[in-house]
Amino acid sequence: MSSLVLQCWKLSSPSLILQQNTSISMGAFKGIHKLQIPNSPLTVSARGLNKISCSLSLQTEKLCYEDNDNDLDEELMPKHIALIMDGNRRWAKDKGLDVSEGHKHLFPKLKEICDISSKLGIQVITAFAFSTENWKRAKGEVDFLMQMFEELYDEFSRSGVRVSIIGCKTDLPMTLQKCIALTEETTKGNKGLHLVIALNYGGYYDILQATKSIVNKAMNGLLDVEDINKNLFDQELESKCPNPDLLIRTGGDQRVSNFLLWQLAYTEFYFTKTLFPDFGEEDLKEAIINFQQRHRRFGGHTY
């Protein structure tokens, strides 16, 4: 007798029927935790079946339909995704590699995510590349990152995306500052996805620089105290784009780490244990599906 113990989501039928001498498509499913196959090969069949069965003993704790394209709602697509790209160092250490090998995946993986996001109709990605606190890391690692960030132009200048950099640029190496200026100038006319990279950025820093700018304008008679409101403050922040709808953090930690503190007030958060170098198309779609299943009230009530 074949046996199947599972939790199942997003199948075209709420019930699963097992019969002998038929096959189960493992390619259509993900999240298999336990699998026992006694002396029988597993036959791959067409995807999308609403009846699945097998002639072997299959035990699983979680079975989930993987074909996420049909589950995405274009009308509920987030316009702006904030991304904390965490887990590069752990990815390298888990493989017995130097941490630099993990960091090398940052821009290629980010470009991959931008390509996927563009096809899905997402308009803005804001990616946290280097925080104001990351200077505390070992000098060798920081030096490597500064050199690696100079690959920005080669990676994105011909990608079709518009690139903007936020953060305190004056503290960065001069060669990197020139690379940033060249990349922003080269891509400013691109009509595709807007990629905002937070480099030497922190939420505290952004709020403080906005406050100082407003105070300076008030002291110089350029605005009255009564003119100061949320909209004015928004304009003084470096991000200068609509606030994120969805924040995705890879690597398992569940905190914002001083990222976009003002802008995340009503953002939906999604945390995944997947390390950033392993974060791919299905992971992104899974995060978006999770986002689309939420009811955003923005502090109000809907009945």
From Swiss-Prot:
Active site: D86
CDD domains: Cis_IPPS
PROSITE patterns xref list: UPP_SYNTHASE (PS01066)
One GO BP: polyprenol biosynthetic process
One Gene Ontology cellular component annotation held by this UniProt entry: chloroplast stroma
Enzyme class: transferase
Residues spanning the membrane: none
Pfam families for this protein: Prenyltransf (PF01255)
Transit peptide limits: 1-45
Entry annotated with the keyword Protein transport: no
Record-level Gene Ontology MF annotations: (2Z,6Z)-farnesyl diphosphate synthase activity; ditrans,polycis-polyprenyl diphosphate synthase [(2E,6E)-farnesyl diphosphate specific] activity; magnesium ion binding
Enzyme Commission no: 2.5.1.92
Listed InterPro entries: UPP_synth-like, UPP_synth-like_CS, UPP_synth-like_sf
Record's function text: Specifically forms (2Z,6Z)-farnesyl diphosphate (Z,Z-FPP) from dimethylallyl diphosphate (DMAPP) and isopentenyl diphosphate (IPP). Also able to use nerylpyrophosphate (NPP) as substrate. Involved in the biosynthesis of several sesquiterpenes.
Family: Belongs to the UPP synthetase family.
UniProt-listed NCBIfam families: uppS (TIGR00055)
Protein name from the UniProt record: (2Z,6Z)-farnesyl diphosphate synthase, chloroplastic
GN (gene name): ZFPS
